[in-house]
């Protein structure tokens, strides 16, 4: 009789027993959850407005600064990128809402959309997600999380933002270089180019433009800001790919597995690490709910329950409840799995 282990859900945890968060955690919650969400929504509506102006009115949202490429080329390039980004976003929303309805902590943490929805409306769930990462002391797991989440969420960055930001960067450079050459009388153009080789020089040129054309300087400032954000994001993606190739992939594909032609998938490994961290967290904090007696199990001596089992596999007193569904009958059975089943590396028993 085969059985499948059902993962922990939010209703299995008493969120009221989660320790009070520090002010730094609350600040991170505001910045990384609410501020980023508002920024993404504003950028999305800005993209929609630009796309409508391009396709319906055959013009840019501003007529002051023209793109680096010809309008007939940049028009379809920008519109295609915006439409592609919107389609990817809709696809991610559909998958994210499906994951959100499952209420599984691990799958909700691994999906960016469902993780954001949970965090926006419940700070305690944000704390649970943070505890998953903070309780892992292994540097390899931290690099693994960084690499996985950067690579798994790179579609919109590569196909929706990168082509536009490259054109924005070239347009910004050409406008500033033109202004630099016009204002530097009696000097060679390469000397003017040298004034734009760092961020300080670019900002000074934008300040100079503001003296004669304030609206143009504002547009250039927003273009510069979005381009810097894109450079940071694409740098993180490149770093995550390098980390995956050099450090993570060799761990998955050892010499013995190469001979057998077997390779462990990244997503399954990340899910396993999150499950272990989550089990360790709820055990140490004692925040897991026992539905049968309306109390919590594990944790300190006041809430910890001991179970006696005749089987040697259940010799450890620290247990975690699991739910098994048998395929041949529609019945569920609650059993208490020992902690050593979640952390076999701490015990001498070998599990096949």
UniProtKB/Swiss-Prot annotation:
<dbReference type="GO" id="GO:0015079">
    <property type="term" value="F:potassium ion transmembrane transporter activity"/>
</dbReference>
<keyword id="KW-0472">Membrane</keyword>
<feature type="topological domain" description="Extracellular">
    <location>
        <begin position="98"/>
        <end position="227"/>
    </location>
</feature>
<feature type="topological domain" description="Cytoplasmic">
    <location>
        <begin position="58"/>
        <end position="76"/>
    </location>
</feature>
<dbReference type="InterPro" id="IPR031606">
    <property type="entry name" value="Kch1/2"/>
</dbReference>
<dbReference type="GO" id="GO:0005886">
    <property type="term" value="C:plasma membrane"/>
</dbReference>
<keyword id="KW-1133">Transmembrane helix</keyword>
<comment type="function">
    <text>Low affinity potassium transporter that, with KCH1, participates in high-affinity Ca(2+) influx system (HACS) activation during the response to mating pheromone. Directly promotes K(+) influx and HACS may electrochemically respond to this K(+) influx. KCH1 and PRM6/KCH2 act at the apex of the calcium signaling pathway that is used for survival during prolonged exposures to mating pheromones.</text>
</comment>
<feature type="topological domain" description="Cytoplasmic">
    <location>
        <begin position="249"/>
        <end position="352"/>
    </location>
</feature>
<dbReference type="Pfam" id="PF16944">
    <property type="entry name" value="KCH"/>
</dbReference>
<dbReference type="GO" id="GO:0005934">
    <property type="term" value="C:cellular bud tip"/>
</dbReference>
<protein>
    <recommendedName>
        <fullName>Pheromone-regulated membrane protein 6</fullName>
    </recommendedName>
</protein>
<feature type="transmembrane region" description="Helical">
    <location>
        <begin position="37"/>
        <end position="57"/>
    </location>
</feature>
<feature type="topological domain" description="Extracellular">
    <location>
        <begin position="1"/>
        <end position="36"/>
    </location>
</feature>
<keyword id="KW-0406">Ion transport</keyword>
<feature type="transmembrane region" description="Helical">
    <location>
        <begin position="77"/>
        <end position="97"/>
    </location>
</feature>
<feature type="transmembrane region" description="Helical">
    <location>
        <begin position="228"/>
        <end position="248"/>
    </location>
</feature>
<dbReference type="GO" id="GO:0071805">
    <property type="term" value="P:potassium ion transmembrane transport"/>
</dbReference>
<dbReference type="GO" id="GO:0005775">
    <property type="term" value="C:vacuolar lumen"/>
</dbReference>
<dbReference type="GO" id="GO:0043332">
    <property type="term" value="C:mating projection tip"/>
</dbReference>
<keyword id="KW-0813">Transport</keyword>
<comment type="similarity">
    <text>Belongs to the KCH1 low affinity K(+) transporter family.</text>
</comment>
<keyword id="KW-0812">Transmembrane</keyword>
<keyword id="KW-1003">Cell membrane</keyword>
<dbReference type="GO" id="GO:0000324">
    <property type="term" value="C:fungal-type vacuole"/>
</dbReference>
<keyword id="KW-0926">Vacuole</keyword>
């Amino acid at each position: 009789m085969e059985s499948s282990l059902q993962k922990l859900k939010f209703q299995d945890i008493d969120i009221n027993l989660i320790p009070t968060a520090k002010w730094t955690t609350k600040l991170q919650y505001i910045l990384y959850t609410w501020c980023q969400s508002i920024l993404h929504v504003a950028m999305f509506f800005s993209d929609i407005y630009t796309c409508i102006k391009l396709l319906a009115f055959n013009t840019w949202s501003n007529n002051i600064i023209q793109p680096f490429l010809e309008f007939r080329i940049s028009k379809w390039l920008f519109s295609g990128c915006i439409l592609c980004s919107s389609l990817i976003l809709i696809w991610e929303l559909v998958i994210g809402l499906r994951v959100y309805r499952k209420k599984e902590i691990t799958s909700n943490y691994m999906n960016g959309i469902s993780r954001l929805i949970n965090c926006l409306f419940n700070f305690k769930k944000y704390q649970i997600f943070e505890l998953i990462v903070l309780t892992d002391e292994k540097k390899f797991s931290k690099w693994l999380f960084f690499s996985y989440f950067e690579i798994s969420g790179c579609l919109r960055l590569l196909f929706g933002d990168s082509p536009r930001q490259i054109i924005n960067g070239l347009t910004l450079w050409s406008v500033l270089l033109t202004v630099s050459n016009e204002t530097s009388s009696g000097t060679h153009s390469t000397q003017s180019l040298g004034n734009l080789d760092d961020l300080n020089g670019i900002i000074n040129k934008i300040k100079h433009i503001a003296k004669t054309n304030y609206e143009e300087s504002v547009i250039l400032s927003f273009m510069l800001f979005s381009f810097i954000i894109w450079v940071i994001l694409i740098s993180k993606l490149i770093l995550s790919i390098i980390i995956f190739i050099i450090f993570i992939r060799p761990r998955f594909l050892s010499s013995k597995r190469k001979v057998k032609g077997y390779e462990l998938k990244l997503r399954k490994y990340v899910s396993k690490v999150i499950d272990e961290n989550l089990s360790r967290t709820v055990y140490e904090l004692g925040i897991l709910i026992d539905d049968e007696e309306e109390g919590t199990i594990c944790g300190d001596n006041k809430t910890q329950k001991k179970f006696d089992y005749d089987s040697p596999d259940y010799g450890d007193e620290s247990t975690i409840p699991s739910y098994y569904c048998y395929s041949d009958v529609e019945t569920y059975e609650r059993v208490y799995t020992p902690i050593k089943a979640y952390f076999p590396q701490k015990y001498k028993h070998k599990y096949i």
